[in-house]
């Protein structure tokens, strides 16, 4: 994973309205970031350290965290971003 994990964690915390000093969920949030990056890479996207890839990974991780107990599919906006990112690469 080429995405800056520390930056991604800080951005995930911001999106979830968590204080930067609160580290109680860091292990789970880091696991979500890793899972989101792995899912993106499994779909054929080669992640870089670009801000676009960091934000895509953050958006995936936040969506997975917020919808972990729901039976809803990926939102259209996120599916389209993932697809557009994949298309630019090929």
Model region roles, listed by residue range:
Residues 2, 67-90:
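Protruding loop/beta-arch "assembly-hinge" segments enriched in small, turn-prone residues
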Residues 40-47, 64-72:
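Amphipathic alpha-helical interaction segments
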Residues 1-53, 85-90:
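Conserved short "hinge" loops at termini or chain/domain junctions
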Residues 53-55, 80:
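Short alpha-helical linear motifs
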Residues 55-67:
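Short, hydrophobic/amphipathic alpha-helical patches that form generic packing surfaces
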């Amino acid at each position: 994973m080429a995405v800056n994990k520390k930056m991604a964690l800080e951005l995930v915390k911001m999106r979830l309205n968590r204080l930067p000093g609160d580290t109680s969920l860091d292990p789970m949030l880091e696991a979500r970031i890793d899972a989101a990056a792995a899912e993106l890479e499994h779909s054929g996207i080669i992640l870089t350290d670009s801000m676009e890839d960091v934000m895509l990974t953050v958006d995936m991780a936040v969506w997975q965290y917020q919808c972990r107990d729901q039976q809803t599919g990926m939102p259209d906006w996120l599916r389209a971003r993932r697809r557009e990112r994949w298309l630019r690469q090929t």
